[in-house]
From Swiss-Prot:
Taxonomic classification: Eukaryota, Metazoa, Ecdysozoa, Arthropoda, Hexapoda
Organism: Drosophila melanogaster (Fruit fly)
Listed GO CC annotations: organelle membrane; plasma membrane
Record's subcellular location: Membrane
Keyword Membrane: yes
Protein name as it appears in the record: Solute carrier family 53 member 1
């Protein structure tokens, strides 16, 4: 692998601009060679002057790159030093908890697990040290990659120009640079390993390193997993084509609406899951750090192939169940046993309490889902409102769940539906507005909670108003459908016009918010990226234009649906079954740009690891910190109001903000 590819594969995405610009420097070298005057056509002195001028420009560029790297490394090293001091202080406090101070120090310093320390405190310390260690490894990787980059490019310089100026410049400047000579990062890593081994894991280094280990950057996927994804995906495609052909020629029987509603929700879930896997692949390939954005464990999380594997396996099961439903009579099995079996398997997989089948990922999903349902009572993180947005694209699945509960609760036999199907259709129509509003309510409640925590009316109250418009759309649609007997013609029904007006307003509101707020497009400083933003992650600008147009079309797809249904060309259930997968696809495209926008926010803050707080923090503290971070120099200016000893205290603080000296440990600095 060439170094340029190695660098691209191993950089920390949030620090991308702070690395050596290896490609630009290599392009400068090749351009200089191509544009150099020919020694056969001009005097040798002119060639010498040309390369001397180029070397001046090239090494000036190297100076700028070196200064950039030194500055960033020093800032991150100082940040790591302060962070370790804080963690070490919390650990010392926890170690002394529950022991009288009169005891000797060696008796007080026993492992956390054997002391009277709250389990939550121990867990927070373990997580904080683990995340801090990851940040140290990323910084060490930054140090090594940049030194290797300078060594490679200067060696290439000497080889192409047949000189040794690059080697001498490396010796005089790079090998004497602060980012290379400073070894505090190695000492911090060693002291962190020692603290976790001795004070948290009771001297068990193997267990400590298992907790701290960082997965190899650019780790390859298991060939066995790749094989299974290909096998089950191919099988699903074949079976899906078979299902379509069988449905066209044999149909779903007399109660086709019941069959359609039974299999629609699982298909949407499977489609959504598979497209999430494609999302993860796209994010990873483009350098969007979804692991950080969702605050996943960087040492243990599902890859795109793991997600696709689960989706493709359930896709095969879904197709087999549909075929069993269609051919129930020749097979001699109860017709409605197939959908019940499908739902049972999916529920058993999700709720399986054993530590099998990606248990950590499943428990994470369940925990986030509970937080979504409890939206007004929980602090809202990115994963919470992202999942709630996904649920807003799966309203038909929500509508089918009450039907299933009613159907299997009333049906005396699994062979034939009887009157249960028609009764449950009427039953669901009464619950329709309540169930349809639920996903929008979850996001509405989250926005209100975020406003309560941050006291910022924009964007949170404005975003809440966007979801509130969905309430009116559902209510007016329900009133229209319940008054069709009173008003035989739609144009005579006043609720029809209320419904249309609310739907148009809601769609325009949602589309504008998608493009401007969620995706950050139509930036006035977009420059060459017309109608987009100044910085884009994905390689093709046409992908962004496709997303803008596709989102507009699918946001207003209800107009086509309403026209065809009102004209009597198609049944409502059939139209919903066709449009529901398209809405999931719209959300799939939306996910790319939403996470890109969040990723660029992290890049602006150089945030590459999770911010784990060990000390308890209430919402007011968190709100204050968020506001200070949003303000220019907000954290530095927070002491300006203090009159007594202001200047001397500032001077003292500046003296204390230093890196470790050679031979000095973190504990010496904190003591």
């Amino acid at each position: 692998m060439k170094f340029a590819e190695h660098l691209t594969a191993h950089i920390t995405p949030e620090w991308r601009k702070q690395y050596i610009n290896y490609e630009e420097m290599k392009a400068m070298l090749y351009a200089a060679i191509e544009q150099s005057p020919s020694a056969e056509l001009v005097e040798r002195e002119m060639v010498t002057r040309y390369f001397a001028k180029f070397d001046e420009e090239f090494f000036h560029y190297c100076d700028k790159e070196l200064a950039k790297i030194n500055t960033f490394y020093s800032e991150k090293m100082a940040e790591a030093t302060r962070k370790y001091g804080s963690l070490r202080s919390e650990l010392t406090e926890a170690l002394e908890m529950g022991h009288p101070k009169k005891l000797p120090a060696w008796k007080r310093r026993t492992p956390l697990g054997k002391k009277n320390v709250p389990a939550r405190k121990i867990q927070d310390l373990k997580l904080a040290f683990s995340e801090f260690y990851l940040g140290l490894i990323l910084l060490q990787n930054y140090q090594n990659l940049n030194f290797t980059g300078f060594r490679k490019i200067l060696k290439k310089h000497d080889k192409l120009l047949s000189v040794d100026y690059g080697a001498r410049w490396r010796t005089d400047h790079v090998e004497a640079a602060h980012f290379y000579t400073n070894k505090d990062i190695d000492r911090l890593i060693q002291e962190t390993e020692q603290a976790v081994t001795q004070d948290i894991e009771g001297g068990d280094r193997q267990r400590a390193m298992k907790r701290l280990r960082v997965p190899p950057l650019g780790e390859q996927q298991s060939p066995w997993t790749t094989f299974k994804v290909g096998l089950f995906s191919g099988a699903f495609v074949v079976l899906f084509i078979t299902v379509v052909i069988a449905a066209m020629f044999y149909g779903f029987g007399e109660n086709w609406r019941a069959g359609m509603r039974m299999f629609r929700a699982p298909f949407l879930i499977i489609e959504c899951l598979f497209l999430w896997g494609v999302n993860v692949y796209g994010w990873r390939s483009s350098g969007v750090n979804h692991v950080l954005i969702f605050e996943l464990d960087p040492r243990n999380h599902l890859s795109e192939q793991n997600i696709m594997e689960v989706a493709s396996v359930f896709g095969v099961i879904w197709a087999c169940c549909v075929l069993s439903y269609i051919f129930c009579d020749p097979l001699g099995i109860p017709q409605y046993a197939a959908p019940l079996c499908l739902y049972t398997l999916m529920a058993a997989f999700l709720l399986n309490p054993t530590k099998t089948f990606h248990h950590e990922a499943r428990f994470w999903a369940i925990r986030i889902l509970i937080r979504v349902i409890m939206a007004p009572f929980c602090f809202v993180n990115f994963a919470d409102f992202w999942l709630a947005d996904q649920l807003n694209s799966m309203v038909p699945a929500f509508l089918d769940i009450p039907f299933l509960i009613c159907f299997f609760g009333r049906s005396p036999t699994w062979h034939k539906a009887g009157k249960a199907a028609s009764h449950c259709v009427e039953y669901v129509s009464l619950l329709h507005p309540i169930v349809a509003i639920m996903p929008a309510y979850f996001r509405f409640a989250q926005c209100i909670r975020r406003y309560r925590d941050t006291k910022e009316s924009f964007p949170h109250l404005v975003n809440a108003a966007k979801y509130a418009t969905s309430f009116f759309v559902v209510i007016f649609a329900h009133k229209y459908h319940t008054t069709t007997d009173t008003y035989p013609l739609s144009k005579e029904n006043p609720w029809f016009y209320c419904w249309i007006t609310a739907a148009i307003f809601s769609s325009c509101y949602a589309y504008t918010w998608d493009i401007k707020m969620d995706w950050g497009l139509f930036d006035s400083k977009a420059g060459d990226n017309r109608f987009l933003r100044e910085e884009i992650v994905y390689s093709s600008t046409w992908f962004y234009y496709f997303g803008i147009i596709e989102d507009l079309i699918l946001r207003f797809s209800w107009t086509l649906s309403m026209s065809l249904i009102e004209a009597g060309y198609i049944e409502g259930d059939v139209m919903m079954t066709i449009l529901s997968p398209l809405e999931v696809f719209r959300r799939f495209i939306w996910n790319y740009f939403r996470l890109e926008n969040e990723h660029l926010n992290n890049v602006g803050k150089f945030r590459a690891v999770r911010d784990i707080s060990v000390a308890p923090m209430d919402c007011s503290d968190q709100t204050t910190i968020l506001r200070m971070m949003d303000e220019t120099d907000g954290v530095l200016n927070r002491r300006r109001g203090k009159a007594a000893g202001g200047k001397s205290a500032t001077k003292k603080n500046k003296q204390e903000q230093r890196l470790l000296l050679q031979g000095e440990s973190i504990e010496d600095l904190c003591s």
